[in-house]
Curated annotation (Swiss-Prot):
Residues bound to [4Fe-4S] cluster 1: 22, 58, 92
UniProt-listed NCBIfam families: miaB-methiolase, MiaB/RimO family radical SAM methylthiotransferase
Gene behind the chain: miaB
SMART domains: Elp3
Official protein name in the record: tRNA-2-methylthio-N(6)-dimethylallyladenosine synthase
GO molecular function term, any single one: 4 iron, 4 sulfur cluster binding
């Protein structure tokens, strides 16, 4: 027997990843897991038996850094018990904080920004390091091809990263860098690979996803709408979604894709942030309320059944009650299916950081008023689905025997009694009941 044959197989190394924040972080965590898989790591859901713990952070929400340091504090006993445990911090807080993370928390071995995670395996082999550079090379070119394993029926696919808009409240241009669009060929290859592994729904991701542009196979310039049409041509793919968008990049070809492409779901998340022209200017949003409302009219004319969702920030520096009333008026005018609303929180390094904040109690009251209006609209939208027949893609079994849970065309969670169904089935469901955050129905005859 040769020495090679007699060597024991290397011990399996276990990787635990905690993902904070947006869908792109979910995608990034998956790609980092695949990169570390090439190093012999397998994912574990048990943090205590991991050989590496990776915290993939988000910097959008309030007190993101404090939440990270709190989680790291809870890892101190585990690191003391197992000094060989590698602890890494990835994502946008890693980009923003850099070496400060290791200074405050020496238990952290690795700090890697979102544009450098293709170098995570080399950093792990080195044992310790910080990499928050914006490399010239495309990180996707250096990541291993995903393993040919069966996938869940819905998947994310990053097509664009970074943002050039520089909204006054936002850290994304500083943590994710300038806008970069992935090449058409790479996107289509990854989409085909996902479909070959059982994916029926793809959500295209980007910080400013509808700003994507690239060169098509014939050498012409493509916009995001043309990319969607090309992805829709993939046999076996049934649904396409995308997030997150900027109103200024809702080009004619993208609106036309909503009109013409049946695989593009009738759902659009289009953040507006405020219903006051004065505040929109202070935020550097580069559009007016009227421009947003006219855009909504064009979108609804192209796709009358579309559900619109949005984001709002209340209590932005300088916001008056009149500005707040303008936001309420915009919400009433559009009638959103759902929306996310937050009280402004300052982000170091952003233009709005040094501006005087309004009184906290005033901002809290405005947020409550806005959320009450948005909740009433969401309730009406949910109730309006009762009696309708919707497409539902089953993603997992429900808690009850014979029950399946899936997503509707409009991204609702839908509960259905379907004992013979399986994950990945795309079925028609007649909606019979609505709840604040879900629907229930029966299989259509």
């Amino acid at each position: 027997m040769s020495d090679q044959a007699s060597k024991p197989a290397p011990a399996v190394k276990k990787l635990f990843i905690k993902t904070y924040g947006c869908q792109m972080n979910v995608y990034d965590s998956q790609r980092m897991a695949e990169a570390m898989g090439a190093e012999g790591y397998v994912l574990t859901e048990n943090q205590s038996d991991a050989d590496m713990v990776l915290l993939n952070t988000c910097h959008i929400r309030e007190k993101a850094a404090e939440k990270l340091y709190s989680d790291l504090g809870r890892l101190k006993p585990l690191k003391a018990e197992r000094p060989d445990l590698k602890i890494g911090v990835a994502g946008c807080v890693a980009q923003a904080e850099g070496e400060e993370i290791q200074r405050r928390m020496p238990i952290v071995d690795l700090v890697v920004g979102p544009q450098a995670y293709h170098r995570l395996p080399a950093m792990a082999r080195a044992g310790r390091g910080v990499d928050t550079e914006f490399p010239a090379e495309d990180k996707f070119e250096h990541l291993p091809k995903p393993a040919a394993t069966r996938r869940a029926p819905a998947a994310f696919l990053t097509v664009q990263e970074g943002c050039d808009k520089f909204c006054a409240f936002c850290v994304v241009p500083y943590t994710r860098g300038a806008e970069v669009s992935r090449p058409v060929s790479r996107i289509l290859a990854e989409a085909r690979d996902l479909v070959a592994r059982g994916v029926r729904e793809i959500t295209l991701l980007g910080q400013n996803v509808n700003g994507w542009h690239g060169e098509g196979p014939e050498g012409s310039e493509w916009g995001f709408g043309r990319l969607i049409r090309a992805i829709a041509e993939i046999d076996g793919l049934d649904r396409i979604r995308y997030t997150t968008s900027h109103p200024n990049d809702m080009a004619d070809d993208l609106i036309a894709a909503h009109r013409d492409e049946p695989k593009l779901m009738p759902y659009l998340h289009l953040p507006v942030q405020s219903g006051s022209d004065r505040i929109l200017k202070a935020m550097n949003r580069r559009h007016t309320v009227d421009q947003y409302l006219r855009l909504i009219e064009r979108i609804r004319e192209a796709r009358p059944d579309i559900m619109l969702t949005s984001d709002f920030i209340v209590g932005f520096p300088g916001e008056t009650d009149q500005d707040h009333q303008g936001t309420l008026e915009l919400v009433r005018a559009v009638n959103f299916g759902t929306a996310f609303s937050f009280k402004y929180s300052p982000r170091p390094g952003t233009p709005a950081y040094e501006r005087p904040e309004i009184e906290g109690a005033v901002a809290d009251a405005r947020l409550q008023e806005l959320q009450a209006l948005l909740t009433s609209q969401q309730k009406a939208a949910q109730e309006g689905m009762v009696g309708r027949e919707l497409g539902v893609l089953f993603e997992k079994p429900g808690r009850n025997p014979g029950q399946m849970v899936g997503k509707s065309d409009y991204l609702h969670a839908v509960f259905v009694e379907a004992p013979a169904a399986k994950v990945g089935d795309l079925v028609r469901v007649r909606i019979t009941h609505s709840a604040p955050n879900s629907l229930a129905g029966v299989l259509a005859a």
